């Protein structure tokens, strides 16, 4: 018969293992996350759906997915969102698989997160949990405009400058061409009038012809008289 001390010694390791297992248990939480500001739409498949979340129980959690960093806050959804677990079930021996969805949970909250930029903490700055929170909204660059999109505005100004000046130059050229064309037309009119009207001012061609004709008639008359 075993002594009580031996039995206690045999039981103690089991209790220790159970305590270790209880300490190693982790609570599993499901969070519905809505991301915005993503450039590459396939980055979730590239990172194999792995991410790191900091401060999930706080008002403003921060999440890192691959090289992207997102920050956001919890919001109410328009309706009830249901989360399923996707699985594969083989239908027949030939290898045809069927996608099966298994209900996991439902929620009426979502974590709306926007891509943000982190800055290195400098000496003398106040401690903000090691992370700087950026208040940014969609299409709103009023906060830190020079850092985020200054180069974009410079290129837009350079591209818009020649484009805006070009119509003005064309209008100037067209006005100059019209002015020169009007001047040439006026010069042609003046030259044409000078060629058609070589006589002195005040005398018409009909008067000149009549005077010449009368002169020849007078000459003939004088010659006849002499003869």
UniProtKB/Swiss-Prot annotation:
GO terms for cellular component: nucleus. Residues 157-227 are annotated as: Disordered. The keyword DNA repair does not apply. Residues 203-227 have a biased composition (Polar residues). Keywords: DNA-binding, Nucleus, Transcription. InterPro entries: GTF3C6-like (IPR042771), TFIIIC_triple_barrel (IPR019481). Belongs to the TFIIIC subunit 6 family. Involved in RNA polymerase III-mediated transcription. Integral, tightly associated component of the DNA-binding TFIIIC2 subcomplex that directly binds tRNA and virus-associated RNA promoters. This is General transcription factor 3C polypeptide 6. It comes from Mus musculus (Mouse). The gene is Gtf3c6.
């Amino acid at each position: 018969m075993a002594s009580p001390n031996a039995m206690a010694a045999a039981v103690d390791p089991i209790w220790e293992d159970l305590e270790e297992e209880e300490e190693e248990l982790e609570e599993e939480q499901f969070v519905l996350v809505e991301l915005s500001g993503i450039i590459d739409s396939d980055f979730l498949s590239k990172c194999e759906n792995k991410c790191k979340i900091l401060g999930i129980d706080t008002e403003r959690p921060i999440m890192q997915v691959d090289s992207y960093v997102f920050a956001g806050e919890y919001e109410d959804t328009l309706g009830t969102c249901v989360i399923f677990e996707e699985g594969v079930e083989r239908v027949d021996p030939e290898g045809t698989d069927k996608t099966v969805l298994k209900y996991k949970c439902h929620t009426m909250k979502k974590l709306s997160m926007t891509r943000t930029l982190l800055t290195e903490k400098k000496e003398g700055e106040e401690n903000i949990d090691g992370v700087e929170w950026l208040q940014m909204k969609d299409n709103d660059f009023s906060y830190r405009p020079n850092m985020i999109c200054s180069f974009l505005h410079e290129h837009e100004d350079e591209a818009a400058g020649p484009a805006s000046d070009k119509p003005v130059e064309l209008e100037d050229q067209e006005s100059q061409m019209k002015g020169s064309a009007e001047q040439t037309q006026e010069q042609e009119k003046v030259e044409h009038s000078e060629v058609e009207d070589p006589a002195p001012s005040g005398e018409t061609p009909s008067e000149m012809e009549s005077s010449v004709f009368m002169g020849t008639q007078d000459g003939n008359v004088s010659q006849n008289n002499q003869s």
